[in-house]
Design a protein with these regions (language model features):
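Basic nucleic-acid-binding interfaces
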Residues: 1-191
């Protein structure tokens, strides 16, 4: 991510995300965005994750995103805001009454970079807690943690163990073989 979002860009994305969630929970059509109304950086393809947390206790209420850019950033945020509210399989769909009690967090992702390493036991030392988001792949299995997850799992070995579990594997899988590992960074902002 060479260019950072301006404060106006961030506000715009948060408004787009909230309005998309309101419309979706009220069964209204999600607005087709006219890209000419947005800054050039918001019109560029970008990858994002949208995270919903409860205001009362900060607990996760939904989180969906894309690891690679395939559509304009503003549309990516709009799409993933609705998906986080309605399609995160870990939670029931957000209701209209809940919306005012949720905070929206948006993470704009850099392009993932493949991490080269030759010994699984060296992997924890290559990760930068609080900085790197991590993608693990093993065959058809894949999982990611955003850099914000380091706040709950600051130890790299524990971080990797939880990520292996999320991938549907044993927690020590990362110690047993060379997995395909990519890292990325985020520009994170919230309401």
């Amino acid at each position: 991510m060479d260019e950072q979002l301006t404060s106006d860009d961030k506000k715009t994305l948060l408004v787009v995300a909230r309005q998309a969630i309101v419309n979706a929970t009220q069964k209204k059509k999600v607005v087709d965005l006219d890209l000419v109304n947005f800054s050039s950086i918001l019109r560029e393809n970008g990858a994002s994750f949208v995270t919903l947390n409860r205001k009362s206790d900060g607990q996760l209420r939904g989180c969906i995103g894309a690891l690679e850019a395939y559509q304009p950033l503003v549309q990516d945020v709009q799409y993933h805001a609705v998906a986080a509210a309605l399609e995160d399989y870990r939670f029931p769909p957000v209701t209209t009454n809940e919306i005012q009690n949720l905070t929206i967090e948006i993470s704009r992702l850099s392009a993932p970079v493949n991490l080269k390493y030759d010994n699984p036991l060296n992997l924890p030392g290559l990760l930068r807690p609080g900085v790197d988001g991590v993608i693990l792949r093993d065959g058809f299995k894949k999982a990611t943690f955003l850099p914000q997850v380091w706040e709950q799992l600051p130890d790299p070995e524990e971080f990797l163990a939880h990520l292996c579990r999320k991938m549907g594997d044993r927690p020590d899988r990362w110690k047993m073989k060379l997995l395909d590992v990519s890292i990325y960074q985020v520009e994170e902002f919230h309401e």
